[in-house]
UniProtKB/Swiss-Prot annotation:
Cofactor: pyridoxal 5'-phosphate
Aminoacyl-tRNA synthetase found in the keyword field: no
Gene3D superfamilies: Alanine racemase, Lyase, Ornithine Decarboxylase, Chain A, domain 1
Alphabetically ordered keywords of this record: Isomerase, Pyridoxal phosphate
Protein name, entry field: Alanine racemase
Annotated catalytic residues: K40 (proton acceptor), Y263 (proton acceptor)
Pathways per UniProt: Amino-acid biosynthesis; D-alanine biosynthesis; D-alanine from L-alanine: step 1/1
Family stated for the protein in its record: Belongs to the alanine racemase family.
This enzyme's EC code(s): 5.1.1.1
Residues with N6-(pyridoxal phosphate)lysine modification: K40
Length: 366
């Protein structure tokens, strides 16, 4: 998808805020812990290459979800370790080796496929994934983990780490978290051969369970300044939201009582009023169900009226503003603020999704 550089809708990313967030988190966690910045999904919508370069001196490596995301960083000149958290195709192992990427091995079945590939396994770097209760990928028993590690050793693979992922680290109820942690700790302690790196801490764990950190952490949503729990748990350290989303009025008019706005005529004016149109819609990640939510115009909240279209939306204005007036969809204007979490709460989702859905049509400015 082409970035729409000639349209007045832009996501502004404060790279200094991201750096400050990492500094604050580092002050909150134990020293001498290896730090991975999670920059998957285009750095949660913030721009993977720009973010990775901005924090290069603050982290030891990066986490991405797939091979293509890793290759994007390598092609941009990022030379630190890149850990691919998802499972890659065994047929793509040569690419991973060529670009010195660390891959995740999550099952014996996948390993049997990998063994058939004609590659130099001594150049392959691996972390083993343990499914301690998340239910997605990973080995599920000590026996399976030991067997996997034994085969990897026989193949001459560089076995660098072992890790798991918590399902409820951002929940006030710790029962599931404690169960997963106990399982993972016991498995690691009983391994026949323990890799050098052991990590289980994602953003939430690093904030609220820092006592459980092993010797590496994966920092995701927190470096972008968002609370992993939404508003459920209080943050133990200050964070600043790094992304703001802005557009501008491209059309302003007065409508009369009885006039409708948008597909399905879902909004009908009860009285004469001014309305304005913004060049942003659901193709940009501003979803159709945002009708009734608010944006900021000159520091005042204005309602989104009518259904959000693919490329445009309409807002009710208190007066006739000139074309080109700035409108804030996420961020601060004057004393008022709209956060990604506010948007998520309105949609009935999580702040992660709000940012990740912002499409490539929206240019990022730094």
């Amino acid at each position: 998808m082409i970035s729409s550089l000639h349209r007045p809708t832009v996501a502004r990313v404060d790279l200094e805020a991201i750096r400050a967030n990492i500094d604050h988190i580092h002050q909150h966690i134990p020293k001498k812990v290896r730090t991975y910045a999670v920059v998957k999904a285009n750095a949660y919508g913030h721009g993977a290459v720009a973010v990775s370069k901005a924090v290069e001196d603050q982290v030891d490596g990066y986490c991405v979800s797939n091979l293509d995301e890793a290759l994007e960083l390598r092609q941009a000149g990022i030379d630190k370790e890149i850990l691919i958290l998802g499972v890659i195709l065994a047929s793509e192992l040569q690419l991973a080796i060529k670009h010195q990427l660390t891959i995740t091995v999550a099952s014996l079945e996948w390993l049997e496929l990998a063994k058939k590939e004609s590659v130099d396994f001594s150049q392959l770097h691996v972390h083993v994934k343990v499914d301690s209760g998340m239910g997605r990928i990973g080995v599920r028993s000590l026996a399976e983990a030991n067997q996997l590690i034994s085969i990897l050793s026989d193949m001459g693979v560089q076995l660098d780490g072992i890790f798991t992922h918590f399902a409820t680290a951002d929940d006030s109820d710790h029962a599931m978290f404690d169960k997963q942690l106990t399982f993972f700790k016991q498995l690691v302690e009983q391994l026949d051969k323990r890799p050098a790196l052991v990590h289980a801490s994602n953003s939430a764990t690093s904030l609220w369970h820092s006592e459980t950190i092993f010797n590496a952490i994966r920092l995701g949503i927190v470096i972008y300044g968002l609370n992993p729990s939404g508003n459920s748990l209080s943050l133990p350290c200050p964070l600043k939201e790094a992304l703001s989303l802005e557009s501008r009025l491209v059309h302003v008019k007065q409508i009369q009582a009885g006039d409708s706005v948008g597909y399905g005529a879902s909004y009908v004016a009860a009285e004469p009023e001014y309305v304005g149109t913004l060049p942003i819609g659901y193709a940009d990640g501003w979803t159709r169900n945002m009708q009734g939510f608010k944006v900021l115009v000159e520091g005042e909240f204005c309602d989104i009226i009518g259904r959000v279209s693919m490329d445009q939306l309409t807002i009710r204005l208190p007066k006739a503003y000139p074309i080109g007036t700035k409108v804030t969809l996420i961020g601060q204007q004057g004393k008022q603020v709209i956060t990604a979490t506010d948007v998520a709460d309105y949609r009935g989702t999580i702040n992660y999704e709000v940012l990740c859905l912002l499409s490539d049509r929206i240019p990022r400015e730094y």
